[in-house]
């Protein structure tokens, strides 16, 4: 993947490779020691997202594992198979 600044991801729509909308990127979590990206934190969740068994924050925002990200462009595209 190309290098992208953090602020270019915030507010991007997250969709599965099948085109199902999941929500909007609110934040990113990372390992402070290594800098490894861990999760995308999503807000404005869709009804479809509610049916997925995703880890949640205390505020009930969905956490998408960063290793599920396939592409970043106009949307953040994730592999639904990698969400479990």
Regions found by a protein language model. Name each.
Residues 1-84:
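Peripheral interaction segments used for macromolecular assembly
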